[in-house]
Amino acid sequence: MSDENRLVAAVRTEFGKGAARRARRDGQVPAVLYGHGEDPRHLNVPSREFAAILRAHGTNAVLTLDIDGKEQVALTKSVVVHPIRNYIEHADLLVIKKGEKVTVDVPVVVTGEAASGTLVAQDAATVSLEADALHIPEQIEVSVEGLEVGTQILANQLELPKGATLQADEELLIVNVVAAPTAADLEEETGEAEGETAAAPAEEGAES
């Protein structure tokens, strides 16, 4: 495990909303570490370093926690982000062991350009995989280079990294290539919208 994913975690002794606010004010993220039949451990991890790891390695980042001088490898299982201020409010961390398999949702990234006159619709932003806990892919790439209208890519067509297996429905639609709207289509939609807008005041006037 790279040192860049190492965090010094402090065991929490205070709980509740007030304690969580104080921790965040002091630059810490309240977290719970659980798994493998162990009692949950309540921790604080440094928010700046934790956020940097998530930016670099995604939401399934694997961490090496230093807890009272002892190392524990953990998977970032879930992160709660403040909807307005965009800071990390809380994290759930899962204890993992070497050689263990875990099920995670991995982001799907579309690459390339489809044929001229097409529009690429991505129907699934993530796909569920089972992978080695220490070798979780940060993303799955799907190339749409040169694809024509009517082409669909399903989950079972994804190229998965070695050791990873699909857990999602094999028929899950990932990408759908459709015809791009023409200028005439857009003008027609605009005209219909304007007609509906104009009709609304007329109907209100008739009722009054």
Swiss-Prot record:
One Pfam family in the UniProt entry: Ribosomal_L25p
Comp. bias (Acidic residues): 185-195
Region Disordered: start-end pairs: 185-208
Entry keyword set: Ribonucleoprotein, Ribosomal protein, RNA-binding, rRNA-binding
UniProt xrefs under InterPro entries: Rbsml_bL25/Gln-tRNA_synth_N, Ribosomal_bL25/Gln-tRNA_synth, Ribosomal_bL25_b-dom, Ribosomal_bL25_C, Ribosomal_bL25_long, Ribosomal_L25_dom, Ribosomal_uL5_bac-type, UreE_N
Residue stretches of biased makeup (Low complexity): 196-208
Disulphide bridges, residue numbers: none
A cellular-component GO term for this protein: cytosolic large ribosomal subunit
SMART domains hit by this protein: UreE_N (SM00988)
Gene Ontology molecular function: 5S rRNA binding; structural constituent of ribosome
Source domain of life: Bacteria
Family: Belongs to the bacterial ribosomal protein bL25 family. CTC subfamily.
General function of this protein: This is one of the proteins that binds to the 5S RNA in the ribosome where it forms part of the central protuberance.
PANTHER family per UniProt: RIBOSOMAL PROTEIN L25/GLN-TRNA SYNTHETASE, ANTI-CODON-BINDING DOMAIN-CONTAINING PROTEIN (PTHR33284), RIBOSOMAL PROTEIN L25_GLN-TRNA SYNTHETASE, ANTI-CODON-BINDING DOMAIN-CONTAINING PROTEIN (PTHR33284:SF1)
Family matches, as NCBIfam families: bL25_bact_ctc, PRK05618.2-1
Identification of the protein by name: Large ribosomal subunit protein bL25
Organism: Rhodococcus opacus (strain B4)
